[in-house]
Amino acid sequence: MFAFLRGELVTVSREEAVVEVSGIGYLLHISSGTSRRLPPEGSQVRLFTHHYVREDAQQLFGFLDEEELQLFRLLLTIGGVGPKLAMAVLSGLSVGEIQEAIVANRPETLYGITGVGKKTASRIILELRDKILKIQPAASGKTAGAPQALQLNEDALAALMTLGFPKPAAQKAISGILETSPGLSVEEVVRAALIAIHNNF
C-alpha cells in the first residue's frame, strides 16, 4: 500500500516512530537499530514501509533502508514468524549479523534473541539460508542485486497468496523456480509457480 513515507519525525521511541505527512501522523513500528539511527525529532526523514493487514488490525512497519525491509519480509515467509517476532530479530542483531548467522549455520547466534528459541532459530536458518546465499553469495550484505531479488520473491509470493494458494506451497514453488531460473520476471515466476503447484496436486 505504501512504499515509503517522507515527512517530519514527530516522536521516536525504541519501538515506534510517528512521522507527519501532510498533516497526518503515521505510527510506525520500528526496530531498535532503526530507532538509534533516526535523526532528532523535528527532522525530515524517509522510512520504507511494510503495511501488515489481518482481520482485526492494520499495522505499519518502518525501515531506514531497503535491506532491513527485505529481510523483515523474508522472515515473514517462515511459518510461525509474525511481524512482532521478525522485529525482535531485527532489534537483536544487525542485518549483516543476521545474514552471517544464517549463512554460517549458527543458530546459537539467533536463539540468544528474546522470543527466538532453538527450534525457531533452526527453522530460520533452514528456510532462509539458500535464499540469502542466492542473493548474496559472499554474505557481505553489499550485493547490488539483493534488494531486487528479495522484492521479486515478495511480489511473486503476494501474487500467489492473492490467488488463494497457501504461503508454504507458494514459497516452496517460488524458491525452486528461482534456484533453477534466477533471471525471470515476477510474471514469469508466478506462471511457472502456478504450473509447479498444480503438478504437485
Curated annotation (Swiss-Prot):
<dbReference type="InterPro" id="IPR013849">
    <property type="entry name" value="DNA_helicase_Holl-junc_RuvA_I"/>
</dbReference>
<dbReference type="Pfam" id="PF07499">
    <property type="entry name" value="RuvA_C"/>
</dbReference>
<dbReference type="InterPro" id="IPR012340">
    <property type="entry name" value="NA-bd_OB-fold"/>
</dbReference>
<keyword id="KW-0963">Cytoplasm</keyword>
<feature type="region of interest" description="Domain II">
    <location>
        <begin position="65"/>
        <end position="143"/>
    </location>
</feature>
<comment type="function">
    <text>The RuvA-RuvB-RuvC complex processes Holliday junction (HJ) DNA during genetic recombination and DNA repair, while the RuvA-RuvB complex plays an important role in the rescue of blocked DNA replication forks via replication fork reversal (RFR). RuvA specifically binds to HJ cruciform DNA, conferring on it an open structure. The RuvB hexamer acts as an ATP-dependent pump, pulling dsDNA into and through the RuvAB complex. HJ branch migration allows RuvC to scan DNA until it finds its consensus sequence, where it cleaves and resolves the cruciform DNA.</text>
</comment>
<keyword id="KW-0234">DNA repair</keyword>
<dbReference type="InterPro" id="IPR000085">
    <property type="entry name" value="RuvA"/>
</dbReference>
<dbReference type="GO" id="GO:0006281">
    <property type="term" value="P:DNA repair"/>
</dbReference>
<dbReference type="GO" id="GO:0009379">
    <property type="term" value="C:Holliday junction helicase complex"/>
</dbReference>
<comment type="subunit">
    <text>Homotetramer. Forms an RuvA(8)-RuvB(12)-Holliday junction (HJ) complex. HJ DNA is sandwiched between 2 RuvA tetramers; dsDNA enters through RuvA and exits via RuvB. An RuvB hexamer assembles on each DNA strand where it exits the tetramer. Each RuvB hexamer is contacted by two RuvA subunits (via domain III) on 2 adjacent RuvB subunits; this complex drives branch migration. In the full resolvosome a probable DNA-RuvA(4)-RuvB(12)-RuvC(2) complex forms which resolves the HJ.</text>
</comment>
<protein>
    <recommendedName>
        <fullName>Holliday junction branch migration complex subunit RuvA</fullName>
    </recommendedName>
</protein>
<keyword id="KW-0238">DNA-binding</keyword>
<feature type="region of interest" description="Domain I">
    <location>
        <begin position="1"/>
        <end position="64"/>
    </location>
</feature>
<feature type="region of interest" description="Domain III">
    <location>
        <begin position="154"/>
        <end position="201"/>
    </location>
</feature>
<feature type="region of interest" description="Flexible linker">
    <location>
        <begin position="144"/>
        <end position="154"/>
    </location>
</feature>
<dbReference type="GO" id="GO:0006310">
    <property type="term" value="P:DNA recombination"/>
</dbReference>
<dbReference type="GO" id="GO:0009378">
    <property type="term" value="F:four-way junction helicase activity"/>
</dbReference>
<dbReference type="InterPro" id="IPR011114">
    <property type="entry name" value="RuvA_C"/>
</dbReference>
<comment type="similarity">
    <text>Belongs to the RuvA family.</text>
</comment>
<dbReference type="InterPro" id="IPR010994">
    <property type="entry name" value="RuvA_2-like"/>
</dbReference>
<dbReference type="InterPro" id="IPR036267">
    <property type="entry name" value="RuvA_C_sf"/>
</dbReference>
<keyword id="KW-0227">DNA damage</keyword>
<dbReference type="GO" id="GO:0005737">
    <property type="term" value="C:cytoplasm"/>
</dbReference>
<dbReference type="Pfam" id="PF14520">
    <property type="entry name" value="HHH_5"/>
</dbReference>
<dbReference type="Pfam" id="PF01330">
    <property type="entry name" value="RuvA_N"/>
</dbReference>
<dbReference type="InterPro" id="IPR003583">
    <property type="entry name" value="Hlx-hairpin-Hlx_DNA-bd_motif"/>
</dbReference>
<dbReference type="GO" id="GO:0005524">
    <property type="term" value="F:ATP binding"/>
</dbReference>
<keyword id="KW-0233">DNA recombination</keyword>
<dbReference type="GO" id="GO:0000400">
    <property type="term" value="F:four-way junction DNA binding"/>
</dbReference>
<dbReference type="GO" id="GO:0048476">
    <property type="term" value="C:Holliday junction resolvase complex"/>
</dbReference>
